[in-house]
């Protein structure tokens, strides 16, 4: 079903995804596209162009009842997260949760979950989204000056047509604060001793500029930065 929904999703907005040429039960195939990830060739100027491209080509707004959007967001954010926590606890019964991270007191997992402003998160913005808008999933061809999105999420709580725009914005924000390309290349350090954890990672070049650009975009469009 994941593969099927991914293909269905591309048909809702084919210009931003590669065209799937071959489909199997557990795989799909599309032609090689000559481009590099945004992590590899991004610049602050290009990031502004990316946001403009996303706004005009990807984030197509949908009009649906508020109750329907609330239902989808609750399923995607709350129900799915709670399910993943339960699965983790079941698979790791002896795991010691840290009480200190980088020297700061950290509430228990249960308290953190309770502190999340769920009601605010359930008020999403219905829009077509990528669903996993990490910078390594954004390709750019310098010669043609075109963007292409890969490795898209198949659906948002079952919906292939739309999801919550805030989710894409949050993915971008997270990718600025922590460069996932560095994580993949093991450019980070993690030490877990007893109930204490120390984490350090390499910052992305121009991260502060990217953050300001995204902050300005969020404010300009009257989005809720707290929710992002």
What do these predicted ranges mean?
Residues 5, 9, 53, 209-217:
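Amphipathic alpha-helical segments that form well-ordered structural scaffolds
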Residues 1-3, 40-48, 162-166, 204-207:
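Flexible, glycine- and charge-enriched loops at secondary-structure boundaries
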Residues 222-228:
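All-alpha amphipathic helical-bundle segments outside canonical DNA-binding/catalytic cores
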Residues 6-14, 37-129:
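Conserved kinase catalytic-core helix
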Residues 155-218:
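Active-site activation/catalytic loop segments of kinase-like enzymes and analogous catalytic loops
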Residues 113-163:
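Active-site acidic catalytic loop and adjacent metal/ATP-binding pocket
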Residues 27-36:
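Conserved short submotifs of the Hanks-type protein kinase catalytic core
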Residues 1-26:
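Conserved NTP-binding catalytic cores of kinases and kinase-like/nucleotidyltransferase enzymes
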């Amino acid at each position: 079903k994941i593969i099927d929904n991914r293909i269905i999703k591309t048909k809702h907005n084919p210009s931003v995804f590669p065209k799937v040429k071959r489909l199997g039960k557990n795989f799909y195939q599309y032609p090689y596209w000559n481009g590099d990830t945004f992590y590899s060739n991004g610049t602050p100027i290009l990031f502004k162009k990316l946001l403009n491209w996303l706004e005009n080509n990807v984030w197509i707004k949908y009009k649906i009842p508020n109750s329907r959007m609330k239902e989808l967001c609750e399923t995607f954010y709350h129900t799915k997260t709670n399910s993943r926590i339960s699965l983790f606890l079941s698979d790791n019964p002896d795991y010691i949760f840290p009480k200190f991270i980088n020297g700061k007191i950290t509430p228990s997992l249960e308290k953190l979950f309770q502190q999340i402003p769920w009601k605010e998160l359930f008020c999403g913005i219905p829009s077509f989204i990528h669903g996993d808008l990490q910078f390594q999933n954004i390709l750019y061809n310098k010669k043609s000056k075109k963007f292409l999105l890969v490795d898209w999420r198949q659906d948002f709580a079952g919906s292939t047509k739309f999801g919550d725009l805030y989710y894409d914005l949050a993915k971008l924000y997270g990718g600025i604060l922590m460069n996932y390309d560095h994580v993949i290349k093991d450019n980070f350090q993690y030490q877990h001793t007893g109930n204490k954890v120390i984490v350090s990672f390499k910052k992305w070049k121009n991260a502060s500029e990217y953050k300001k650009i995204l902050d300005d975009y969020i404010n300009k469009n009257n989005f809720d930065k707290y929710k992002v």
